[in-house]
Each structure stands twice: as C-alpha cells, then as structure tokens.
Amino acid sequence: EKLTLHSKWITTLVDGLLNPVEYLERLQAAFDDPAPNHRPWVVVEKVLARGEHLNPLWPVAGTTGYDALDVLNGLFINRRGARLLRRFFQRLTGDCRGFREEVYESKRQIMEGSLRSGVTILVHELKRLADASWTTRDISIYALEEALSGFMASLPIYRTYLGDGQGTAFERDIVSDSLELAARRAPSVDRSAFAFLRSLLLDDPPPEEGLAPRRAQIVARLQQYTSGVHAKGVEDT
C-alpha cells in the first residue's frame, strides 16, 4: 500500500482478507491525508451471487466487473441448451441431482479433504467458546462440526461481512436460511448446535459479558473461511 500511495499508479489486488472493509477504509484514509480532494478510483474483485449487491457503505467505486460480465456473457448463451446438456450428463453419469445438491456435496468433499485442517481449527474454537457458557457447554464437538460444515456447504455466496454493524439485511437473511437448510439436511444433528451458530453469527442474543471479543474473532475467521470453501467447492470441484 505504501508503494501504491507513493507511485500513484501501481495497482494491487487483495484477496481473502479477514476484514476487507477495514482495509478499504484505511486505504482511502491514507489517500485523504495528503490529497483529500483527489480520492483514488478503487474497485474490488467481488463475485456477486444472484440477489446479492455490493454494500453501499464500502468506500469503493464498484467491482472489477464480474457482475457485468455475467450479464454480457448471457448474450452468447442459448438457455435452451442447458436442458439438453443436463439430460446428456444424467444419461452419461446416472446422476440426477440438481446443481445445488452437487455444490453441497462438492463443498463437503473439499472440507473433508484439502481444507480439513481449517475446519478442525474452527470447530475447536467454537467448542471452547461454547464451553465458556453454561447454556451451550453441553453441545458436542461432533454436533458443532456437522453444523458448521453443513452451514458452510449450504451458504450460496462466497462470504458475509457480519460484525461491527457491517452486515446487510440480505446477509442476515441468507445466514438464517442457510442454517435452516443445513439443519434440514442433517436431522440427526443436535439442533442446539445450529442455534449456537445462529446466535454467534447474528449476535442474537448478545454475548455474555467478557465473551464478545472472542466471539467477534471467531465470526471474522469463519466468514473468511467460507470464501475459500465456496471457491474450491464451486469453481474447482
């Protein structure tokens, strides 16, 4: 960033940040100090799902254009061909699952394979947090792992940006919907594990005294991790 500020022409691309909003605010503030009337043109590489919009509070001009390309590329695609390709695929493989179920299974596969270590770390952090309160200490580590994996596999977007009042109504709704879907997909898993995740992510109810900093850190790392799971599960698997 210092090189960018000094040269005024070098561009950088950030990916997978724990708190991209804070980074963007600090970047803009750094430009404001020497030249408050000459703010840089900053765009972010952000893939937006259907119905998802860039948070208007972010100090950026927009995205690098994936959302525009999604619309433009549609001009070159015959939608009727999708049905033919789907039928051919089903005849060839015998797999009649829909795309959403394919994505769900692919993301579960990734979390049980190459991204296993990260999931394990998150689960143990969740268990330590749950053990800190008498209302959640009985939730087993198995239930937490199944609830977490099911939630991340059911989340239809790369990540959310909840915490510090940054989250949008869309993000809160999609977290609730994804947790409900994950719970339906795993009827044998303790419901209290899903309720614990919901309380953690949506900050409802607020944390007990002394637990807020730890909760905020776990939420930040969990949200950071879902983007990698989505990228590997949807794009690469």
Where in the sequence are the language-model features?
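Alpha-amylase-like alpha-glycosidases and glucanotransferases acting on alpha-linked glucans and related
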Residues: 1-9, 15-237
